[in-house]
Amino acid sequence: MEQLVNELIEANVGRVLVDEPLARYTTMKIGGPADILIVPKHVAGIEKTLQLVKKYKTKWTVIGRGSNLLVSDLGIEGVVIRLGEGLDHLEVEKHRVRVGGGYPLIKLSTLLSRQGLAGLEFASGIPGSVGGAVYMNAGAHKSDISNILSKALILFEDGTIDWLTHEEMEFSYRTSVLQTKRPGIVLEAEFQLQIGEREGIVSVMQKNKDYRRETQPWNHPCAGSVFRNPIPYFAGDLIEKAGLRGYQIGGAQISEMHGNFIINTGGASAQDVLSLIALVKQTIKDKFSVEMHTEVEIIGR
């Protein structure tokens, strides 16, 4: 591991941090250390990192802004690549937008709305990066990334870089081809938006933000929606009907505001959250005969 660290530093891939606690990189403020954390300065840094990872046959994981993650208390084995700096470029040409995978999604939706571009209003309250949003087909307010993405530039596990079209991304509810079938890193996304009326777009954005502020516990560390909606039901409704609102294990609590959110009340461990998730799954299955599946990504040892 020491030799890999030295080569990463010599290759100038970006910041190289050893045994770096990941709690500071997730919105839930939970997570043990990464053996090696890389914050790349540019695409070339990511490519070189993957070359060295392959050379040393080391496991690797990519995270964005940590908004949809639950990281194990034991941390993550191998190399963790955190996207953000160096992948935050933006190019707007009429209604076509090309943006780096590390660009903050809320910042992007706000900026484009002020320019009178419609299509990203749904993302006004979704934390995280563009790359993470494309990876999981993030959505809200009856829309999602699949409605606006035309193509994405992907760095695959074998080091090759290629564009995937909308069809090749194989989007479905909160999923894409990148999650299992063709794992890779979203370096850049191209969106096709619509030219609209600025005041109306900004108004919708503000309405969406207000709704989230009034109904979701963003004043506490959390990872967003924990469970996927088991269509035709809503996960939050089922959890609340089961009487689990406010239920707490350790420092993790099912939010009083919204049943599909688990908040860190202070000092919560990943195990606290996992125990709550298991409780919810079993309770909903027993009471309603409905299988619950997590939307939050659970990673680590």
Swiss-Prot record:
One of its GO terms (cellular component) is cytosol. It is found in: Cytoplasm. One of its GO terms (molecular function) is UDP-N-acetylmuramate dehydrogenase activity. Signal peptide: none annotated. One of its GO terms (biological process) is cell wall organization. Keywords: Cell cycle, Cell division, Cell shape, Cell wall biogenesis/degradation, Cytoplasm, FAD, Flavoprotein, NADP, Oxidoreductase, Peptidoglycan synthesis. Its cofactor is FAD. PROSITE patterns: FAD_PCMH. Its main location: cytoplasm. Its EC number is 1.3.1.98. It catalyses: UDP-N-acetyl-alpha-D-muramate + NADP(+) = UDP-N-acetyl-3-O-(1-carboxyvinyl)-alpha-D-glucosamine + NADPH + H(+). The active site is at 174, 225 (proton donor), 295. Belongs to the MurB family. Cell wall formation. This is UDP-N-acetylenolpyruvoylglucosamine reductase 1. It comes from Bacillus cereus (strain ATCC 10987 / NRS 248). The lineage of its organism: Bacteria, Bacillati, Bacillota, Bacilli, Bacillales.
